[in-house]
Swiss-Prot record:
Belongs to the XPA family. GO terms for biological process: base-excision repair; nucleotide-excision repair; nucleotide-excision repair involved in interstrand cross-link repair; nucleotide-excision repair, DNA damage recognition; UV-damage excision repair. Its main location: nucleus. Gene3D superfamilies: XPA C-terminal domain. GO terms for cellular component: nucleotide-excision repair factor 1 complex. This is DNA repair protein rad14. Interacts with hrq1. The gene is rhp14.
Amino acid sequence: MENSSIVKSPNPTIEEQRNEIEKLKNLTGIEEVHVDGAKVNKRKRTFDEQSEITKDYIEYDFSKIEDTKGGYLLEEKKVEDLREKPAERELREQEERQKKLRLAPLNLDPETAPKCFECDSIELDTKYFDIFHCRVCHTCREKYPDKYSLLTKTECKLDYLLTEPELQDQELLPRLLKANPHQQGWSNMMLYLRYQVEEFAKKKWGSMEALDAEFERREVQKKEMKEKKFEKQLLELRKRTRTSNYSRMSIREKRKHVHSYDEEFEKPNEPGVIVQRCKCGLEIEQLEI
């Protein structure tokens, strides 16, 4: 068996180097071979491995793309509008939560389904059940307005003497948000369930009678403060009026006084001393020589 030998020329040509590289690739299975003094032969990428820039076109899933009307398309995640106010965001989240609750399947099992407090009906008001956690149907809600009617935040402050931190705590008093009917850009209108507000007021003040007594005390205190404020303003007005009158009198009626010593008498216990007196009370003494 003869041993084959490869004779390498001292100065191989470029064609010989290429042939040698191809032989090494076939023997070793390597796709890239680095040779000193030669350029690197890189493997070409397949179509799937090409970058987004080198591709002939870019694939988009239009089911995950939203047209923002801004000249470009945004994928997957919806970018939150930074101009949305916190009040608007809170109202939108509440509406989305109520929509999901309305679309949820109704539990028709009479054993496990939640029932109305008043009539045991399973057709509950989803808004009251979701926000106030109150099991009441539409019929009973309209039938008992003294219990299930809604109160504004101002009414809770004035009639039940509740504070702002208490009304902002949703664990104490759940609230229903509605767009402000007076101005669209204003804060949302907050509505509270009447019987929940009354129960919290009883816990805070002890009883409704104690609440009425506190209300009367504050009304009397408010009236006294109002009267004191009025008296203070009246006193300030009188001071300003008196000062202005005096200034006008001093400017218009005040004239230059000229002393006239009409009264003249001798000073007692001091003979020879003559006293002259003016109507304004000024006195001068003269000594007779």
